[in-house]
């Protein structure tokens, strides 16, 4: 740029140089005078030369300016590209920084977790150390106690008797035992407990720690022995129940019941003893069948008999009447439906109560009056029952009984003292 400016100055001031050169030329010819025509021609040429020089300089300057502008444009374009590259690199750096921040957060979380775990582990290690220290102390105590026991040569032997069985008399419940029997049972229980207890064969010179340990073991064994006692007692109770409900016991009970059943000879006697005079017709409305009434005999007192004998005879008669009533009830229950059995049971209870009252009471007159309709219905039902059971009376006896029962039946019982 400085060179271009210097050249432009040179082109602008060529006249000055020419003027300086021209005065030097006319000096050798001082006598000659310049002509005006020559001066005019020279000035025109100089002007032309100056104009040409100026145009060239301007053209060159313009070219240089264009070149300079092109260079500036290229430089700007390069700068723009560099700026774009810088922006991309800056963005990459920012992304890398965000990733680094994320990694740092994750690492901080992991580090915090590791710190928490290390704290927990340290707490566990402390607890384990404390436990180990306590165990070491206990082991040292046990070693000392063991050494002392070995020095003294005293041992405690625990004997557990598994084979000793409990007698069955302990579990059998007797009805209201006396004081002596209660004492004997208490002594037996004490002896059993003593046999089941542990046997102490050591002296009392041992340390309290050993005694506590041995007492704990003894209590555990006692609890085991109690559980075994309960098991044995339950098994024995089950065996006793099985024996109670065995076939032999059931057969014995059935035999006892069979002896109570009325035999064939007794039935024949009951047939003969039945008379229509002493039959009592139950109400036809309440019960549909007839129950045999109680028979009250009237006997005279002989001279050699006492009142006690008369009472025994009356009781025997009452028992016979009860047996007859039970026999007739059984026959009626076998033949009639279950709906009719309720009336028979009620009539049997009423007749039994009347019989007992008649045997116990003193001089009493029992009067039984019944309607004709009720008696006829009762007689018909009694005939049906006896026909079904195979114990029918003869037609003549039934006619006589019907004729006698049409009238009101009155029974007088006189008990002599």
UniProtKB/Swiss-Prot annotation:
In its UniProt record, a GO molecular function of this protein is:
protein kinase C binding
> Phosphoserine modification sites?
27, 35, 37, 51, 202-203, 217, 282-283, 286-287, 292, 295, 326, 335, 358, 362, 389, 395
| Modification sites for Phosphotyrosine | 387
Mod. after translation: The N-terminus is blocked.
Q: Which UniProt keywords apply?
A: Acetylation, Coiled coil, Cytoplasm, Lipid-binding, Membrane, Phosphoprotein
Per the record, its GO cellular-component terms are: caveola; cytoplasm; cytosol; membrane raft; nucleoplasm
Taxonomic superkingdom: Eukaryota
The PTM N-acetylglycine maps to 2
Compositional bias annotation for Acidic residues: 202-218, 367-376
At which residues is Phosphothreonine found? Answer: 195, 367
Specify where the region named Leucine-zipper lies, as residue ranges.
Answer: 62-100
Bias class Polar residues marks the residues at 274-286, 354-365
- Report the locations given in the UniProt record: Cytoplasm, Cytosol; Membrane, Caveola
Family named by the database record: Belongs to the CAVIN family.
Q: What is known of its domains?
A: The leucine-zipper domain is essential for its localization in the caveolae.
Q: What else is known?
A: Binds phosphatidylserine (PS) in a calcium-independent manner. PS-binding is inhibited by phosphotidic acid and phosphatidylinositol. Does not bind phosphatidylcholine.
Subunit structure as annotated in this protein's UniProt entry: Component of the CAVIN complex composed of CAVIN1, CAVIN2, CAVIN3 and CAVIN. Interacts with CAVIN4; this augments the transactivation of NPPA by CAVIN4. Binds to PRKCA in the presence of phosphatidylserine. Interacts with CAVIN1 and CAV3.
Q: What is this protein called?
A: Caveolae-associated protein 2
Organism, scientific name: Rattus norvegicus (Rat)
**Origin organism lineage:** Eukaryota, Metazoa, Chordata, Craniata, Vertebrata
């Amino acid at each position: 740029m400085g060179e271009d400016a210097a050249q432009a100055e040179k082109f602008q001031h060529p006249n000055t140089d020419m003027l300086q050169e021209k005065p030097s030329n006319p000096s050798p010819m001082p006598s000659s005078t310049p002509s005006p025509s020559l001066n005019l021609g020279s000035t025109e040429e100089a002007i032309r030369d100056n104009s040409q020089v100026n145009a060239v300089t301007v053209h060159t300057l313009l070219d240089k300016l264009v070149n300079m502008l092109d260079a500036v444009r290229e430089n700007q374009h390069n700068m723009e590209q560099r700026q774009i590259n810088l922006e991309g690199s800056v963005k990459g750096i920012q992304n890398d920084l965000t990733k680094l921040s994320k990694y740092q957060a994750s690492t901080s979380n992991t580090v915090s977790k590791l710190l928490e775990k290390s704290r927990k582990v340290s707490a566990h290690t402390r607890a384990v150390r404390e436990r180990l220290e306590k165990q070491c102390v206990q082991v040292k105590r046990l070693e000392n106690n063991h050494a002392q026991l070995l020095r003294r040569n005293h041992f405690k032997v625990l004997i557990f008797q598994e084979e000793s069985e409990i007698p069955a008399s302990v579990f059998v419940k007797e009805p209201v035992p006396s004081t002596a029997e209660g004492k004997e049972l208490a002594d037996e229980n004490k002896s059993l407990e003593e046999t089941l207890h542990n046997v102490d064969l050591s002296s009392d010179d041992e340390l309290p720690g050993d005694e506590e340990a041995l007492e704990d073991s003894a209590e555990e064994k006692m609890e085991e022995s109690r559980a075994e006692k309960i098991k044995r007692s339950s098994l024995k109770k089950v065996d006793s129940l099985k024996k109670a409900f065995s076939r032999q016991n059931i057969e014995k009970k059935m035999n006892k019941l069979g002896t109570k059943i009325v035999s064939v000879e007794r039935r024949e006697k009951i047939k003969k003893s039945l008379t229509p005079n002493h039959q009592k017709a139950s109400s036809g409305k309440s019960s549909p069948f007839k129950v045999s009434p109680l028979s009250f005999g009237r006997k005279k007192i002989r001279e050699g008999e006492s009142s006690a004998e008369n009472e025994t005879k009356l009781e025997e008669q009452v028992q016979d009447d009860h047996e007859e009533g039970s026999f007739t009830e059984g026959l009626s229950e076998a033949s009639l439906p279950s709906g009719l059995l309720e009336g028979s049971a009620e009539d049997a209870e009423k007749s039994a109560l009347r019989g007992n009252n008649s045997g116990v009471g003193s001089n009493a007159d029992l009067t039984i009056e019944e309607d004709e309709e009720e008696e006829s219905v009762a007689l018909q039902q009694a005939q049906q029952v006896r026909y079904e059971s195979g114990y029918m009376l003869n037609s003549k006896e039934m006619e006589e009984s019907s004729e006698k029962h049409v009238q009101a039946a009155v029974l007088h019982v006189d008990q002599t003292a």
